[in-house]
Design a protein with these regions (language model features):
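Substrate-binding and catalytic surfaces of secreted/luminal carbohydrate-active proteins
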Residues: 47, 52, 132
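Divalent metal-coordination and catalytic microenvironments
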Residues: 24, 47, 63, 104, ...
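Short loop/turn motifs at secondary-structure junctions
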Residues: 18-20, 59, 96, 252
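Short catalytic/ligand-binding loop motif for oxyanion handling, primarily in non-cytosolic enzymes
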Residues: 30-32, 70-73, 109-111, 136-139, ...
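Active-site-proximal segments of metal-dependent phosphoesterases and phosphodiesterases across multiple
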Residues: 28-45, 54-102
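Extended active-site neighborhood of metal-dependent phosphoesterases/phosphodiesterases
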Residues: 1-45, 122-127, 152
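Non-catalytic terminal accessory segments
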Residues: 164-278
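Conserved beta-sheet core of the metallophosphoesterase superfamily
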Residues: 78-160
Length: 278
């Protein structure tokens, strides 16, 4: 590491002579372990020192933490964004950092910070990419590319399990057609969980409601754009409205649909904001 924070597990790693990774320990350990994240005041001071050095040397800094910088989900409204995220945002934006990576929520999301509603979309604001969980189909990871023109691109890719299975001579049909098998697996898993709550409505109605919820859930976690009008016109969604209008599951369904108004699987930081900027 190029530098380590003495009061946390945070550190700076130099990718090369022009790019640093600012790896931030956002976990809370004292007086007990917590789900919520927070950057210590002493760590913020250390970050300020490192970011000043980077600016003086013309270094591009990419900060990364486990906990989220921004509140990016209508479905999960607590324990995701860091408790002192406004302080962290202020510090990062003081140095005009354009991009932040995190996990924790593990719903594939890309969002720009806006100081207040109505701020022009073209105005500066740090953007956060939240990466979804590799363990949940479609088993995605993110590929970040520093391009020669100074731009930085991010795109999700799915682990090629089927390619690996063929290459290693596996005879397991689930691995050889992993994309199809994993989709059916997660669809059934979620549907079965929903049907544990949705009961006494008849086999066809319950199956339709569960399938609708599961389909939206899968697309939501994968960061795909969801056709809100199309979903709300399905028989399964109408069954939700008719049979369980006050259910928390319908509220979750609506939250996921509303959040998914755009695709979150590709992002381009243009060259004027990228790693070769002056």
């Amino acid at each position: 590491a190029l530098s380590r924070d003495s009061s946390s597990l945070s550190y700076v790693y130099a990718l090369d002579e022009k790019n640093w990774l600012l790896m931030l320990d956002s976990c809370q350990y004292e007086p007990e372990n917590k789900v919520e994240g927070r950057i210590k005041e002493s760590t913020l001071a250390w970050m300020d020192e490192q970011l000043l050095k980077a600016r003086e040397q013309g270094i591009f800094v990419l900060p990364i933490a486990h906990h989220n910088l921004l509140a990016q989900s209508r479905m999960y409204t607590t324990q995701c964004a860091m408790d002192n995220n406004s302080e962290v945002i202020d510090l990062l934006q003081k140095y005009r950092l354009p991009l932040f990576f995190s996990g924790h929520l593990h719903v594939q999301r890309v969002r720009k910070h806006k100081a207040e509603p109505g701020v022009d979309d073209g105005a500066y604001g740090i953007q956060e990419i939240i990466t979804d969980a590799l363990s949940i189909p479609p088993c995605q990871y993110g590929e970040v590319v520093w391009d020669e023109d100074g731009s930085i691109s991010y795109e999700t890719r799915s682990v090629d399990v089927s390619g690996w299975a063929r290459k290693t001579g596996s005879g397991n049909p689930d691995l050889l057609d992993f994309e199809d098998w994993s989709y059916r697996y997660i669809q059934k898993l979620i549907s079965d969980q929903i049907r544990g709550v949705v009961q006494n409505l008849g086999e066809d109605v319950e199956r339709s409601m569960a399938a609708t919820y599961a389909g939206v859930y899968i697309d939501y976690y994968a960061g795909r754009k969801i056709d809100a009008k199309g979903i709300r016109n399905t028989k399964g969604y109408r069954w939700w409205q008719r049979n369980m209008p006050d259910s928390y599951l319908l509220r979750e369904l609506d939250s996921m649909i509303t959040d998914s108004d755009r695709d979150n699987n590709y992002f381009l930081l243009p060259e004027e904001e990228g790693w070769l900027r002056e």
